[in-house]
Amino acid sequence: MSFRSQTSSTTSMRPVSSYSSRSISLHRSVPLGSSASVVGGAGGHGARISSGGFGLASGYSSGSSFSMSVKGSGLFNNEKETMQILNDRLASYLETVRNLEQANSKLELQIRETLEKRGPTTQDYSAYEKVVEDLKSQIYDMTVNNARLVLQIDNARLATDDFRVKYESELAIRQSVESDIIGLRKVIDDTNINRMNLETDIESLKEELIFIKRSHQTDVEELRKHISECGVQVDVDAPKGQDLSKIMEEIRAQYETIIQKNREELKDWHNSQILIVETEVKENTEALQKSRTEVTELRRQFQTLEIDIESLRTMKASLEANLHDVEMRNNMEMEGFNFIIRQQEADLQQLRTSIQAQVHEYQALLNIKMKLEAEIATYRRLLDGEDFRLQDALAVQTTKVQKKITVTETVVDGKVVSQSSEVQEIKK
């Protein structure tokens, strides 16, 4: 971003006779009954002054001055000598004018050389801008890396939370499976106790059956023995009674069938229960082993993530320390750059002040030049033989000079990188 500012100043030259520091005065007085005349010439050129008294004086601030006076109450006796003196004074005056013009030209040349010499030094900030851009790019890259690390840490934290939730759910499942296994073990124990009780009942029933068989056999033998000893034969005209032994055999067969059936049913039920329990135990054992494997894997992943998080934290701390160091170095370099900029601005302000002083000096010299030109013109008219008052001539010749000073400044990002000035004179 650049802009230009122009500053214009207009200087109007008033009539020469109005300046107090440099004055040209011409007094003419003609007393009663007196007359004066001066006639002279140099190189075929003459001038006539008719006055009773004549005086001319001029001075200027540079230290060079001349004065010319012609006094008399009558006619001059030596006109050529008087004109020679006037010509010498005029030549000295013109020499002074030429010296002032040369000094003015030298001053303008010095102003241009100063502007050309100091101009490029104030606008060469390319090296500083490159360093600043490099530092800005480094800061931006470190900021992006820091943001990336923060994002990775957040992702790792979310993954850790997810694994923790999975671990807790798997732990709850493991605990429930272990409680189910404990319950199944209790069921197995109860089943074993019932089986042992049933086996005990079977043994007792077998013993009771053997005892009943023996008792029945004893009773039958005793009954047969008693019948044989009695030797009584009784014939009864009645239907033949049932054979008790046959009945006992049938009862025994029925009981054995029932016992065998119950034994087979109990055995089948016991085998089925054992098979179910073994299947459940096998499934629960497999699930428990799988859960243990998953828990081990999750624990390993959790430890790996903890190690990664710790390494990321260490990297983050080191990057923050590096960023702090870079910021400190950047601040120090920026302070140095600001000091250089302030120094350059002070030099620029001093240059502006110097230019302004030189402009004022140039304006003063220009005023002197204009006044001298007016006085030279007046002398020429006097030498040409014109007889009039100098004040009237100076009053008629009013020269107006408009002086335009253009100061151009190029500002980039609030910094003055170049400056130039241009002086224009417009006579009206």
Swiss-Prot record:
Gene3D superfamilies in UniProt: 1.20.5.170, Single helix bin, Vasodilator-stimulated phosphoprotein
Region (Coil 1B): 132-223
Annotated Pfam families: Filament
Region (Tail), start-end ranges: 386-428
A GO-annotated cellular component: keratin filament
Annotated region (Linker 12), positions in chain: 224-247
Region (Coil 1A): 79-114
Region entry Linker 1, spans: 115-131
Residue numbers spanned by region Head: 2-78
Segments passing through the bilayer: none
Renumbered residue ranges of the record's region Coil 2: 248-385
SUPFAM superfamilies reported in the protein's UniProt record: Intermediate filament protein, coiled coil region
Site (Cleavage): D237, A238
Residues covered by the IF rod domain: 79-390
GO molecular function, one term: structural molecule activity
Any one GO biological process: intermediate filament cytoskeleton organization
PTM note: Phosphorylated.
Keywords, ordered alphabetically: Coiled coil, Intermediate filament, Keratin, Phosphoprotein
Protein role: When phosphorylated, plays a role in filament reorganization.
Family listed: Belongs to the intermediate filament family.
Summary of subunit composition and partner proteins: Heterotetramer of two type I and two type II keratins. Keratin-18 associates with keratin-8.
Further remark: There are two types of cytoskeletal and microfibrillar keratin: I (acidic; 40-55 kDa) and II (neutral to basic; 56-70 kDa).
Name recorded for this polypeptide: Keratin, type I cytoskeletal 18-A
Provenance organism: Polypterus senegalus
Phylogenetic classification of the source organism: Eukaryota, Metazoa, Chordata, Craniata, Vertebrata
Gene designation: krt18a
